[in-house]
Amino acid sequence: MARLAGVDLPRNKRMEVALTYIYGIGPTSAKQLLEKTEISPDLRTDALTDDQVAKLRDAIEAEYTVEGDLRRQVQADIRRKIEIGSYQGLRHRRGLPVRGQRTKTNARTRKGPKKTIAGKKK
């Protein structure tokens, strides 16, 4: 089992898919990494040589912010927006959708379960 950026990659997956298990590397980044390191996207993870793993590790460390560093960076960006009092920071603070989605209906994931309010009595 190959270990890259602190993540154990699944053995039986194609490299193109296995690399997406690393936080911060999606399908496009995975393809670019494999092209740069000249590794076939159809190669299975368990068929990688130590040399290929080292190439991938070096390429990831050189070009991408991944896993813990990326998570910290995202959290720091959110904290900064909250501190400067931007509209996005305000939405983060209130636990509402940040990117302009409607909230009259929907937005339940962000707002949590419904809080029932006493209705009009008949």
Curated annotation (Swiss-Prot):
A single Gene Ontology CC annotation of this entry is:
small ribosomal subunit
Lineage, top-rank taxon, reads: Bacteria
The keyword tRNA-binding is annotated on this UniProt entry: yes
A Gene Ontology biological process noted in the UniProt record is: translation
Task: Tell me a Gene Ontology molecular-function term this record carries.
Answer: rRNA binding
Question: Where does the record place the region Disordered?
Answer: 93-122
What is said about its interaction partners and assembly?
Answer: Part of the 30S ribosomal subunit. Forms a loose heterodimer with protein S19. Forms two bridges to the 50S subunit in the 70S ribosome.
Q: Which NCBIfam families match?
A: uS13_bact
Which protein family is named in the record?
Belongs to the universal ribosomal protein uS13 family.
Q: What is the protein name given in its UniProt record?
A: Small ribosomal subunit protein uS13
Species of provenance = Corynebacterium kroppenstedtii (strain DSM 44385 / JCM 11950 / CIP 105744 / CCUG 35717)
